[in-house]
Curated annotation (Swiss-Prot):
Top-rank taxon: Eukaryota
Molecular function GO labels: lipid binding
Keyword Magnesium carried by entry: no
Any Pfam family: Lipocalin
Keyword check for Transport: yes
Family as reported in the entry's similarity comment: Belongs to the calycin superfamily. Fatty-acid binding protein (FABP) family.
InterPro entries the UniProt entry points to: Calycin (IPR012674), Fatty_acid-bd (IPR000463), ILBP (IPR031259), Lipocln_cytosolic_FA-bd_dom (IPR000566)
Protein known as: Fatty acid-binding protein type 3
Keywords: Lipid-binding, Transport
Length: 132
């Protein structure tokens, strides 16, 4: 998991507005989210990872242990049940469940970049981050 530790700045986003629309996010929040370039910082202490996301909309901090479900309030205000899994040292998956839908986020680090693929139903977005 050391591959994730540090800060990552959003460089490019493809199709995120469509994903947010599928989640039922209103147009004003969607514009705020898609116009910002959030920075995500990962820290690791023992088997607990913390992910701090700073954006124009909100700053969120979540700490998690892989494989353990927990309640999360998302930056867009939804309450979801979230589980992270470690797929490899350079790939983690996140599943967010709520009554309306399920969101899958796969983050993969390769060559100094982090690619986050977000899928809700049949809609997919890809966010590219660079290490700062």
């Amino acid at each position: 998991m050391a591959n994730f530790v540090g800060s990552w700045k959003l460089e490019q986003s493809e199709n995120m507005d469509a994903v947010l629309q599928k989640l039922g996010i209103n147009v004003i929040k969607r514009k705020l989210i898609t116009s910002s370039k959030p920075e995500i910082t990962f820290t690791l202490e023992g088997n607990k990872m913390t992910m701090k996301t700073v954006s124009a909309l909100k700053t969120t901090v979540i700490s998690f242990t892989f494989g353990e479900e927990f309640k999360e309030e998302t930056a867009d205000g939804r309450t979801v049940m979230t589980t992270f899994t470690k797929d490899s040292d350079s790939k983690i998956s996140q599943v967010q469940k709520c009554p309306e839908n399920t969101t899958h986020v796969v983050r993969e680090v390769t060559g100094g970049k982090m690619i986050a693929t977000v899928t809700v139903g049949d809609v997919k977005a890809v966010n590219n981050y660079h290490k700062v």
